[in-house]
Amino acid sequence: MKFLNEHIKNNTFKQVYLIYGEETYLVYQYRDRLKQAIIGDDTMNYSCYEGAKIDIKELLTTADTLPFFAERRLIVVQDSGFFKSSTEGLAEYIRSMPEYLHMIFIESEVDKRNRVYKAVSEKGYVSEMKYQPDSVLIRWVEGLVKAEGRTITRPAVQHLLDKTGVQMSNIRTEVEKLMCYTLDKPEITEADIDEICTTQIQNKIFDMITAISMKRQKEALDLYYDLLMLREPPMRILYLITRQFNMMLQVKELVLQRYDQAAIAKQLGIAGFLVNKYVNQSKHFAAEQIREALEYFAESETAVKTGRLDDKMAVELIIVKYSKK
């Protein structure tokens, strides 16, 4: 993204771009920013082709058409499949494309061995838009809120992300709902978030931990696959599982110290109704089992980061291990 921002800022563009990846919000944002920077509102010299049935001859004929009273012609090609299958003549064309021509390819997935991919890499610039880490998302949400003249604390932003997951389009929608809901309030609070924001991730994580604790393995795995379908990254799921087990351990220890529900809620900074849920989950594990699980989670994370274990498989193995009867 750094180089794309520089190209746009300095008005120094590559002739061809490939933007792809799982974070579609960023994919489309940079498509639109590049389009505006390269050609502005010129509709005469702009063409867009979309879908798997694009006529390559028609596309190249358009590409060979000189721009009308302008220096540039821009063609955007979306979801073509050109980067996963053989496309006659396109790679060669890209390598020798006319100077007036600019092309932006938008794809969800690519094969880096593909000839068209290699041609774009050599001639232009390729940018993969991955799901952003929490640190980036937190700053982004803070910026969105600040732009509206409001404030929000870091814990409140994290609480929002726990509900929404990492998809930026979903986060943006929920922030906009919050802005409307809290129209006269200077600060967005966790209570506001609980009141208005749609919970997609947190409830499924909670239900998954409950299924694990009750040894309902199929249910736990089904919930995990649901989270993957929501495009929640496996390592973030592991982070949330770890956090839930940490909370279970703290609740269990406070119960042993004879803290009541209200005192536990105050001590841990959580809602009272959550205490009972954590108590019920923790009943199915000894404190030492939870500590051992937390160590195993850390080992699994290290195995993924060092390339010894696939991230999806790592979380699946955790679920199977701790939901076994």
Residue positions per predicted region:
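Conserved beta/loop motifs at nucleotide-recognition and modification sites
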Residues: M1-K325
